[in-house]
Swiss-Prot record:
Keywords: Activator, Chromatin regulator, Coiled coil, Cytoplasm, DNA damage, DNA repair, Nucleus, Transcription, Transcription regulation. The keyword DNA repair applies. It holds the Pfam family YEATS. One of its GO terms (cellular component) is nucleus. Residues 176-208 form a coiled coil. One of its GO terms (molecular function) is histone binding. This is Protein AF-9 homolog. Component of the SWR1 chromatin-remodeling complex and of the NuA4 histone acetyltransferase complex.
Amino acid sequence: MAPAQAKRIKTLSVARPIVYGNTAKKMGDVRPAIAPSEHTHMWTIFVRGPQGEDISYFIKKVVFKLHETYPNPVRVVDAPPFELTETGWGEFEINVKVHFVDEANEKMLNFYHHLRLHPYTEEDGRRSDGDEVSSVFYDEIVFNEPNEAFFAKMIEQPGNLLPSNKTPDCVFSLQLEQEEIDRIQQGIGKVDEEIEQLKQKLEQDLAK
């Protein structure tokens, strides 16, 4: 809990970027001794900084709730890296609960991630490189009106800024953001063009 004297700073917010998701790879002849015979894949689920930065200054622990068929399905990771590696054969929803450091005095963040084991197909526009499947998402955690103690702790850190360009190890970047903006603008332009064509056709039909 935050100290009683730690007042919240009105009209101010602090954001920190994270990436979360999972990677998976099909197991071959070499497999963990404890892996059940029916398990086909090894996977890792995680919550990280965009470039692997230390995020333990604002995240205290991450709780992963696996499918009930796993022994001890509620797994607590209370030190970085906030990740969990397991084996399995099927995809399922993993409940992820992010608990913040005591100074934050904030409620936990609760969300779900669909564990992806198999490659995306080309039909849905997504792909996985090589034999490793990756299902990773970028998000930003926003702390509205943080208390003074937590705000002071946050500004001591650089803020996990996105890199300018994409790299094999970090696709989330300002370059990717601009590419998404360009795609959206192209889509809007195409819709505007089709609307104008339809408008002209309607005007021609009415003039007949």
